[in-house]
């Protein structure tokens, strides 16, 4: 199945693929992630090298609370482009939510220094939410 050019078999052009993508995106905007997932999984079959579709599958799995599936999908997307920061942020979220805290902390520490302020601030927020907080200093009573 991996060697079949489905676009050619279906006789589809890029405009049909884009319509499918926009329909999937509309379901995401409505919060209907389970329906959107079907669209984006189909898109990854039609164009297995499309980073946007691959990382969107991972992001949808995060929204659905299927964190192990999210990690698999996001790692696949990173094989297409290893330094794609939106994918890395979603992977970081998925790692924390899958209780893989050490991996999430390492990735968040790297991302907090990203030149893109949106990425850096999301990483900072994840660190604030998931990093172990220092124990409060005990206050000694004065006698």
Predicted regions and their residues:
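TPR-adjacent "capping" and linker segments in tetratricopeptide-repeat scaffold/adaptor proteins
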Residues: 2-19
